[in-house]
């Protein structure tokens, strides 16, 4: 695991714990199947997956085999699980679906597959974030384009008001920022850290936002006033 991935994991865990939205874990995935998913061993999975009950079981982290298969380099793993009855919309203990993970990990073909199999493009996790909101922080433009084409709500925010545009501005990606604006992002929506303009330290992104009517919030939070620090680490207190 890279340092950036570890940081993301710790940030997500801390935020979810503070939000109090964890759920109790249920089920228990068969060890043979679980090992096959980890190895990307399609043959072993085909042999040991008896049907939907195993395909939709959960491990100790509350994740389904399909959720874990999103990380496999072999798309055949996810295809087999779906063919065996895996639920494309099954949530883990944080309310995240396989599409949330595929979107924020920039797995374009997995996103395409999940959408084709009925994944809810506007599913909300326990913090209210949709796959598009997650993707805007980490994924490449083609993933966002695919989600929007499938009906993702560009303007929506999570439970704290944070939208895809907030994440794109924080990330400092001009192409993603312009794409979201062109598809109806709300320029001055306020989240706990202010408006999208409050969250960028990049003059180019700031110019793009101002040119179409973006502005800083009138009453900016402590976090938004120190957003340069926020770019690298979410504060654990509000």
Annotated model-derived regions:
Residues 41-49, 74-82, 107-115, 140-148, ...:
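Ankyrin repeat structural motif
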Residues 35-40, 68-74, 101-107, 134-140, ...:
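Ankyrin repeat A-helix N-terminal signature
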Residues 21-32, 150, 183, 191-192, ...:
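Ankyrin-repeat-protein effector appendages
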Residues 25-68:
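N-terminal segments that cap or nucleate solenoid repeat domains
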